[in-house]
């Protein structure tokens, strides 16, 4: 780890103490910072907070003391990405011209290991997992490793102290994290895709959302690489304006892109890389994710053997078209990460078999008409729950689906989907909505879905 002096003897307030908040606090202590930790939750019984307190860190829990920023001098405020910029502490810091920084930027500035960054509305976690596995396969030949970090669930600050210059960090970075980033320089940056109804409750406008995503490449240099989606032409034009890096493109359909999906192979302009039939992940969108992982991995030194070793065995990330089990001849898939319409539009066409779809969740004010053609082509029956059940039912009726079942909860939906299905069908849970009407997170929702399926299997 680089022993940078930027934060040495600086008074720093860490706001929001989730997993990354605690990890960056430990890192800042190593760098010689003087820390104050604050969270609106009571921290008296929080084991990690008390450990830091024992190391001399001031811990303030239960409220956000806005007046503290006026009473004392702070050199930086480190903001948890989930805390909005409308938060009173953040607004006061802005008023007082206290620099607001983020965990990724601090951690990456200390990294001895080169790093690549992946963002996007959908597909970034799967892409990161594929990339990490390919690069790890490549690096293990020389006794080194690739680490998947960031929004994927492992704070960057946790891994940076142990990663060497011969390792590689594969960073999943969200728009929430990127909004606060002013200076990162990934060797490779990639934007898998950008859709216009994602996280607008946080970013307020689509333009703000796009600009946050573009921060992943804005401060790269001319020796770096940027991987862009050739099929999203409007976004591509903005990316060309912003990036200083060498651009490579990928496409689902256009063979003029640097990497593309051919008739039988994933291909580049120079070669046929891998037979599509040998790739384990289902769905055209996962072929696209594979192209991004290939493009990144090639820049970082991996070869086709590394790529084939991973793509021929990797069966998917949890909650992302995750195969759960087979129930009496019916394959069951958990796609709880489908928190928006676009995610459902890539999940639903992923199977050749007839589908019984389970969908529904938080009502964000969107209509579901974009799903009508997919419902018509792929879905034989549908079970709906949550705040959006009636809106989704309207779309299902427009698609001509006859078996439309409306229930109140996911627990009720699972056995009804089984009843509507036949051997040879796929039961697909792809909600097309956020989880917060009935669940804490999409992970929580997906875990419950798997639990309900397993309960059904034991009956």
Swiss-Prot record:
Pfam families: Mur_ligase_C, Mur_ligase_M, MurD-like_N. InterPro entries: Mur-like_cat_sf, Mur_ligase_C, Mur_ligase_C_dom_sf, Mur_ligase_cen, MurD. The keyword Cell wall biogenesis/degradation applies. Pathway: Cell wall biogenesis; peptidoglycan biosynthesis. GO terms for biological process: cell division; cell wall organization; peptidoglycan biosynthetic process; regulation of cell shape. GO terms for molecular function: ATP binding; UDP-N-acetylmuramoylalanine-D-glutamate ligase activity. It is an enzyme of class 6 (ligase). ATP binds at residues 120-126. It is found in: Cytoplasm. Keywords: ATP-binding, Cell cycle, Cell division, Cell shape, Cell wall biogenesis/degradation, Cytoplasm, Ligase, Nucleotide-binding, Peptidoglycan synthesis. Its EC number is 6.3.2.9. GO terms for cellular component: cytoplasm. Cell wall formation. Catalyzes the addition of glutamate to the nucleotide precursor UDP-N-acetylmuramoyl-L-alanine (UMA). NCBIfam families: murD. Belongs to the MurCDEF family. This is UDP-N-acetylmuramoylalanine--D-glutamate ligase. The gene is murD.
């Amino acid at each position: 780890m680089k022993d940078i002096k930027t934060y040495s003897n600086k008074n720093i307030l860490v706001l929001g103490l989730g997993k990354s908040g605690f990890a960056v606090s430990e890192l800042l202590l190593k760098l010689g910072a003087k820390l104050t930790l604050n969270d609106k939750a009571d921290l008296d019984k929080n084991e990690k907070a008390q450990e830091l307190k024992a190391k001399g860190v001031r811990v303030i829990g239960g409220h956000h003391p806005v007046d503290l920023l006026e009473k004392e001098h702070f050199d930086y405020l480190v903001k948890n990405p989930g805390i909005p910029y409308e938060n009173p502490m953040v607004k006061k810091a802005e008023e007082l011209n206290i620099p607001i920084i983020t965990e990724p930027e601090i951690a990456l500035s200390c990294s001895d290991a080169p790093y690549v960054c992946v963002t996007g509305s959908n597909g970034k976690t799967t892409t990161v997992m594929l990339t990490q596995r390919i690069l790890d396969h490549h690096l293990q030949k020389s006794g080194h490793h690739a680490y998947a970090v960031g929004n994927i669930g492992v704070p960057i600050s946790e891994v940076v102290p142990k990663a060497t210059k011969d390792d590689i960090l594969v960073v999943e970075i969200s728009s929430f994290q990127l909004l606060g980033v002013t200076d990162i320089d990934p060797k490779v940056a990639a934007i898998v895709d950008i859709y216009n109804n994602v996280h607008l409750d946080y970013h307020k406008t689509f333009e703000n959302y796009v600009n946050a995503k573009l921060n992943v490449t804005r401060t790269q240099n001319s020796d770096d690489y940027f991987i862009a989606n050739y099929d999203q032409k409007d976004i591509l034009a903005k990316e060309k304006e912003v990036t200083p890096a060498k651009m490579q493109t990928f496409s689902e359909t256009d063979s003029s892109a640097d990497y593309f999906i051919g008739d039988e192979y994933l291909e580049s302009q120079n070669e046929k890389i891998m037979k599509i039939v040998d790739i384990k992940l289902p769905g055209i969108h996962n072929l696209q994710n594979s192209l991004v992982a290939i493009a990144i991995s090639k820049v970082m030194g991996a070869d086709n053997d590394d790529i084939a070793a991973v793509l021929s065995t990797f069966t998917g990330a949890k909650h992302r078209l995750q195969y759960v089990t087979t129930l009496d001849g019916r394959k069951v898939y958990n796609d709880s990460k489908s928190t928006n319409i676009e995610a459902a539009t890539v999940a639903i066409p992923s199977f050749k078999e007839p589908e019984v779809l389970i969908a529904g969740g938080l009502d964000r004010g969107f209509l579901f008409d974009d799903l009508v053609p997919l419902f018509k082509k792929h879905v034989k029956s549908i079970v709906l729950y949550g705040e959006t059940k009636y809106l989704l039912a309207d779309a299902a009726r427009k698609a001509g689906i006859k078996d439309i079942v409306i229930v109140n909860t996911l627990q009720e939906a699972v056995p009804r989907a089984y009843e509507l299905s036949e051997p040879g069908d796929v039961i697909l849970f792809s909600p097309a909505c956020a989880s917060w009407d009935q669940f804490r997170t999409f992970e929580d929702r997906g875990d419950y879905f798997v639990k309900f399926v397993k309960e059904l299997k034991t009956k």
